[in-house]
């Protein structure tokens, strides 16, 4: 690799990603050969991390392994049918390992855990150094996550895959005809807040808890979306298809649905009150989950009355 060339000009993402992956793989092999399974504090640290983070880490490792098998594609809805379900995928991988009698599968899964361990260790070093200088790090919590993420794949029951968050039409976007006509379609699945409520908002609490292990403060992106969020009844991959359509034509393709505010617009005092009450519950839950960390709400957009 020509490191000087990689450091010059714009970031060459694919080349840099390939180089980092090769270096991380070599580091992992060295870790297994010289550290893992021996009396070494680093081996103990890794095992402790592996156990402590199991609630999310195990799913992540399986997701990354399946991505690798699918040529790096994270579009899990296009994977073989058995891999689209977390439970079925784990069952198949377990059967593979049993039949082969090899530990290669476990080794591959632990590679992805190793990379996360390295990243978390580096973040902790940065946070500790910042704290020694009386500096608090600030993180960012987007309101949504990508459809093609381990979060959605592993927790599909808490996401509404029929609706995608975004923003209303904006005439100031002169160079974007779609945004002027329909709005911004961010492609983030909406939450099934009723399901999350039954689970005591476990996914959100874990998300905030992990962020505050490093950050002393964090920005909540699009806080207004917790009260009501503009949503689309189609995936943004279909935006071009909908661009030339009339509202009537779009409705026909979406079972009578059109983009609009969810769970309801602020069209009446009753709806406004309901949206406000629900939003306060969700943001209060996030604030409570943050403990001593400071929460900063970003309110860009159409602020309700």
Name what the model sees in each region.
Residues 1-120, 144-305:
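Alpha-amylase-like alpha-glycosidases and glucanotransferases acting on alpha-linked glucans and related
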Residues 119-132, 136:
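Active-site pocket-lining segments that scaffold enzyme catalytic pockets across diverse folds
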Residues 140:
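Ligand-binding beta-strand-loop-alpha-helix segment within the catalytic cores
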């Amino acid at each position: 690799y020509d490191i000087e060339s990689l450091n010059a000009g714009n970031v060459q993402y694919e080349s840099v990603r390939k180089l980092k992956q090769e270096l991380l793989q070599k580091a992992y092999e060295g870790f297994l050969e010289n550290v893992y399974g021996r009396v070494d504090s680093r081996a103990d640290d890794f095992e402790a991390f592996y156990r402590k983070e199991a609630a999310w880490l195990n799913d992540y490792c399986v997701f990354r392994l399946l991505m690798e098998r699918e040529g790096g594609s994270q579009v899990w809805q296009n994977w073989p049918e058995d891999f689209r379900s977390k439970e079925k995928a784990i069952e198949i991988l377990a059967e593979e390992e049993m039949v082969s009698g090899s530990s290669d599968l476990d080794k591959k899964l632990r590679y992805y855990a190793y990379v996360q361990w390295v990243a978390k260790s580096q973040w902790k070093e940065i946070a500790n150094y910042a704290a020694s200088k009386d500096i608090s790090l600030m993180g960012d919590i987007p309101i949504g996550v990508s459809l093609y993420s381990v979060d959605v794949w592993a927790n599909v029951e808490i996401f509404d895959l029929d609706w995608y968050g975004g923003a209303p039409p904006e005439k100031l976007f002169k160079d974007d005809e779609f945004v002027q006509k329909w709005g911004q379609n961010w492609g983030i699945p909406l939450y099934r807040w009723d399901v999350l409520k039954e689970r005591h908002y476990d996914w959100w609490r874990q998300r905030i808890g992990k962020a505050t292990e490093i950050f002393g403060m964090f920005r909540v992106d699009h806080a207004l979306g917790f009260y009501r969020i503009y949503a689309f009844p189609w995936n943004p991959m279909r935006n071009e298809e909908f661009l030339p359509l009339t509202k009537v034509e779009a409705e026909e393709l979406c079972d009578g649905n059109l983009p609009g505010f969810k769970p309801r617009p602020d069209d009446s005092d009753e709806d406004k009150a309901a949206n406000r009450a629900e939003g306060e519950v969700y943001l209060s839950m996030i604030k409570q989950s943050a403990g001593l960390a400071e929460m900063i709400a970003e309110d860009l957009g159409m602020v309700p009355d």
